[in-house]
């Protein structure tokens, strides 16, 4: 007879995490813990943390993609808080979502008034 001590791990399989099942990078367990700790509701469904982790992962991916585009536009390699802020503030939908958020060490959004612009711009009324 073959003892089970000789076949360690042959029949055993590792538990699959909920993040792995949903193919997510964000930890579903950590999101669930935050939801429970925050006491946002008395009861929490089993799929709510999975869905929220997926939404957060999608939002972070979108913001990072926009920040990477801003970084490339400024001919830089490293994404800095300034690039994240410029990306967020220049996108209407994401800016609405991040309305009350202050990004540390990012500066302000540059706004140039048309009167101070050195280049003469033709208005649309003069073109006709």
From Swiss-Prot:
Name of this chain's protein: Histone H2A.2
Record localization: Nucleus; Chromosome
Job description of the protein: Core component of nucleosome. Nucleosomes wrap and compact DNA into chromatin, limiting DNA accessibility to the cellular machineries which require DNA as a template. Histones thereby play a central role in transcription regulation, DNA repair, DNA replication and chromosomal stability. DNA accessibility is regulated via a complex set of post-translational modifications of histones, also called histone code, and nucleosome remodeling. May be involved in the repression of gene expression in male gametes.
Entries under InterPro entries matching the protein: Histone-fold, Histone_H2A, Histone_H2A/H2B/H3, Histone_H2A_C
Keyword DNA-binding carried by entry: yes
GO cellular component: nucleosome; nucleus
Pfam families with a match to the protein in the record: Histone, Histone_H2A_C
Annotated CDD domains: HFD_H2A
Family of this protein: Belongs to the histone H2A family.
Keywords: Chromosome, DNA-binding, Nucleosome core, Nucleus
Quaternary structure note: The nucleosome is a histone octamer containing two molecules each of H2A, H2B, H3 and H4 assembled in one H3-H4 heterotetramer and two H2A-H2B heterodimers. The octamer wraps approximately 147 bp of DNA.
Tissue: Expressed in the generative cell within the bicellular pollen. Not detected in other reproductive or vegetative tissues.
GO molecular-function terms, A-Z: DNA binding; protein heterodimerization activity; structural constituent of chromatin
């Amino acid at each position: 007879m073959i003892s089970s001590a000789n076949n360690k791990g042959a029949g055993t399989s590792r538990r699959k995490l909920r993040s792995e099942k949903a193919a997510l990078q964000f930890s579903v367990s950590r999101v669930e813990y935050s939801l429970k700790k925050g006491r946002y509701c008395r009861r929490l469904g089993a799929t709510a943390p999975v869905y929220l982790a997926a939404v957060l992962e999608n939002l972070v991916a979108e913001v990072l993609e926009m920040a990477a585009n801003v970084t490339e536009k400024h001919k830089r390699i490293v994404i800095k808080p300034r690039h994240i802020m410029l990306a967020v503030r220049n996108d209407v939908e994401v800016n609405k979502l991040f309305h009350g958020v202050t990004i540390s060490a990012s500066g302000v959004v540059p706004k140039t008034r048309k009167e101070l612009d050195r280049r003469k711009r033709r208005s649309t009324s003069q073109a006709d």
